[in-house]
From Swiss-Prot:
Inducers of expression: Up-regulated by abscisic acid.
Tissue/organ expression: Expressed in flower buds. Detected in tapetal cells, endothecium and connective in anthers and in subepidermal cells in filaments.
Annotated organism of origin: Arabidopsis thaliana (Mouse-ear cress)
Lineage: Eukaryota, Viridiplantae, Streptophyta, Embryophyta, Tracheophyta
Name of protein: Probable plastid-lipid-associated protein 1, chloroplastic
Subunit structure: Interacts (via N-terminus) with ABI2.
């Protein structure tokens, strides 16, 4: 433009530094050429503009990285806890369903094929949820008396298979484990019209793996018969549709009852009969596939399965 050279040639009045009046100090020129202004800004003046960075605002700004980690860790903990609670509830439901399915099966001897299949499915589901993967490392749970509730091994009950239940029935089958002495006692209690007796086998066990034990039977024990020393004598009985009055012979029956009580006390004081078991076929193994404080599932030789419930457990109550 034509005006720019004019401004650059505009005369500026300044004081001569060599003037005789040395008391006056030099002053800055009133006007500066435009090119001088430009040179000053290039050399001495710099303008700093703030840098603005745009980023997404998230939870890090408020709580920091540690806070975020704590939030996610807390959420993860809650999720794991919820799943654990659901798993426990599902296991308890399966246990109750199994106990209900076993009711009335006479430990597996009187069970339909459909019910047996249902029981097998419940057992498999529980085994998949076993809360004690290494039961032989939790011997405190194995300790105590276990009541047999079901088995697929029918040969365990030869007396019942011969159909003599009206005279003698199996009242209870149990297994008592003592991990301190590494002993197992299998016991069958029989109940008759006027007495109860038991047959037991004592064995030692060795731990072979976290789930498997080897059992060696050493001794058999026939318990002392316990006679029923209290017989309720009814006033009458009905035989083939005819009512018979027992009052005339009640005195005689009372005398028999007193004699039975005396015999019962005498027999009960006798020690049980113990005998050694032959060495043949006196060993077996047992694999525990489910274990908690109430329920135990084991598998033995030939794939037989045993369901046992801890004495005193609510699962024994239908």
């Amino acid at each position: 433009m034509a005006t720019v050279p004019l401004f650059t040639q505009f005369p500026c009045k300044t004081l001569n530094p060599s003037s005789s009046n040395t008391k006056h100090q030099s002053k800055s020129p009133i006007l500066l050429p435009i090119n001088s202004i430009n040179r000053r800004s290039e050399i001495g003046v710099s303008v700093h503009r703030p840098d603005f960075k745009i980023r997404a605002t998230d939870i890090d700004d408020e709580w920091g990285q540690d806070g975020v980690e704590r939030v996610f860790a807390s959420s993860s903990t809650v999720s794991v806890a919820d799943k654990a609670i659901e798993s426990v509830e599902e296991t308890e439901r399966l246990k109750r369903s199994l106990a209900d399915s076993l009711y009335g099966t006479d430990r597996g001897l009187s069970v339909s094929s459909d019910t047996r299949a249902e029981i097998s499915e419940l057992i498999t589901q529980l085994e998949s949820k076993n809360p004690t993967p290494a039961p032989n490392e939790a011997l405190f749970l194995l300790n105590g008396k276990w009541i047999l509730a079901y088995t697929s091994f029918v040969g365990l009950f030869p007396l019942l298979s011969r159909r003599i239940e009206p005279l003698v029935k199996v009242d209870e089958i149990s297994q008592t484990i003592d991990s301190d002495s590494f002993t197992v006692q299998n016991s069958v209690r029989f109940a008759g019209p006027f007495s109860t007796t038991s047959f037991s086998t004592n064995a030692k066990f060795e731990i072979r793996s976290p789930k498997r034990v080897q059992i060696k039977f050493e001794q058999g024990v026939i318990g002392t018969p316990q006679l029923t020393d209290s017989i309720e004598i009814p006033e009458s009985v009905e035989v083939l549709g005819q009512k018979i009055d027992l009052n005339p012979i009640k005195g005689l029956l009372t005398s028999v009852q007193d004699t039975a009580s005396s015999v019962a006390r005498t027999i009960s004081n006798q020690p049980p009969l113990k005998f050694s078991l032959p060495s043949d076929n006196t060993q077996s193994w047992l694999l525990t596939t489910y274990l908690d404080k109430d329920l135990r599932i084991s598998r033995g030789d030939g794939g037989s399965v045993y369901v046992l419930i801890k004495e005193g457990s609510s699962l024994l109550n239908p």
